[in-house]
């Protein structure tokens, strides 16, 4: 069986809402095409797979099951610091995106790969763990939580990559936020992912220097 093609796009630094709208356009096109293919299988057209790389200006996003109490900074202070905020349609709680963080949005039709959202999440984690390993950093999973951590076996594990997705008819959107050279001060204004007793970590200034 031939491997499905995936189109890669590097959007650079892009406004969160602009990128979210673009994701939604691609996602909706695939979902609607799958609905049409089911109704008219004789005229079936293949869906397209996309892998979007980008960075965002400072923004907090709250997932559909998130708790607004985990946003610790009010509107006037966000405006003063030039931080946007959006309630969005992915899973998970609150997170931060900003310059120095690699954001990856896979818009994939999982019917080409496997129909298992839990496997998909674990493979997203694995892609980050393997990337970190290439640079001598040990990334790990933490039981009961989605994402990638360092010091997972210690009392205060630190999160280096957050993951939150949406999936409908086995089409995915949203994805990962990988802290490479982010300003971690922005995480002080939220309870990241709604987890009070954990902290966040950078790849460059923390993990690499410590040789984790």
Language model region names:
Residues 206-212:
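Single conserved hydrophobic/aromatic residue that forms the stacking wall/gate
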Residues 181-205:
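A hydrophobic, small-residue-rich beta->alpha segment in the mid-to-C-terminal subdomain
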Residues 160-163:
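Histidine/acidic-rich helix-loop-helix segments that form or flank divalent-metal centers
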Residues 138-142, 173-174, 185-190:
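Short conserved catalytic/interaction loops centered on acidic-Pro-aromatic/His motifs
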Residues 171, 176-179:
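Conserved phosphate/anionic-ligand binding catalytic regions in large, soluble enzymes, centered on
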Residues 1-157:
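N-terminal lobe of the biotin/lipoate ligase/transferase fold
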């Amino acid at each position: 069986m031939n491997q499905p093609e995936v189109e890669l796009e590097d959007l650079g630094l892009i406004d969160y809402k602009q990128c979210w709208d673009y994701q939604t356009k691609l996602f909706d096109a695939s979902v609607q095409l799958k609905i049409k293919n089911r109704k008219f299988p004789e005229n079936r057209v293949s869906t397209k797979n996309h892998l979007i790389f980008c960075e965002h200006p400072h923004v907090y996003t709250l997932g559909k099951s998130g708790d607004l109490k985990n946003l610790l900074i009010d509107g006037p202070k966000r405006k003063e610091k030039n931080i946007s905020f959006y309630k969005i349609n992915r899973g998970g709680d609150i997170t931060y995106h900003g310059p120095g963080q690699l954001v990856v949005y896979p818009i994939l039709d999982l019917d080409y790969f496997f129909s298992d959202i839990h496997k998909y999440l674990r493979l997203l984690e694995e892609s980050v763990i393997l990337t970190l390993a290439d640079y001598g950093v040990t990334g790990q999973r933490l039981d009961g939580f989605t994402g990638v951590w360092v010091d997972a076996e210690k009392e205060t594990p630190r999160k280096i990559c957050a993951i939150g997705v949406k999936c409908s008819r086995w089409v995915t959107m949203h994805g990962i936020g990988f802290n490479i050279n982010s300003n971690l001060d922005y995480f002080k204004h939220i309870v990241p992912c709604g987890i009070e007793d954990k902290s966040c970590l950078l790849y460059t200034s923390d993990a690499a220097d410590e040789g984790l």
